[in-house]
Amino acid sequence: ISRKEASDYIEQYFKTYPKIKGYIDSMVEDAKKTGYSLTMFNRRRPIPELKSSNFMQRSFGERVAMNAPIQGTAADIIKLAMIRVYDALKKGGYKSKLLLQIHDELLVETYPDEIEDVKKIIEDGMKNAVKLSVPLEIDMKQGNNWLEAH
């Protein structure tokens, strides 16, 4: 789409959801005051670019201030889920292994006789990694390799 269409789309989105615009603006203002953004778990992301005299660097800093609290919180949550899944697999004496984390995805090598148990462990670990006011929804797929699982 053109820049104009994208701009119109964003403008309409914020008109429809004005509280989101307010939230984003407050995240940027808070980061400008403190020099960092915070995740829901109070993990700091320094943003020195917000103090730059260079417009492009400052704009980058503002985008970081908008995205870091949300993306950083998601990263914190997936790490907590990984710990829960790893601990449950270890405690249960499973041969299956947590291999890889890609953004909000966990890749688990699972033995055929453990598939159903491991699915339950993953579901519990991811859905209950943290208590929020909204449920954490997950998708789970399986295959003989990563490609098949997608």
Please describe what each predicted stretch is.
Residues I1-Y94, L100-Q101, Y111, K141-H150:
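Conserved catalytic core of nucleic-acid polymerases
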Residues Y23-I24, E123-G125:
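Glycine-rich, charged/polar anion/phosphate-binding loops
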Residues L99-H103, P135:
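Short Gly/Ser/Thr- and Asp/Glu-enriched loop/turn motifs at secondary-structure junctions
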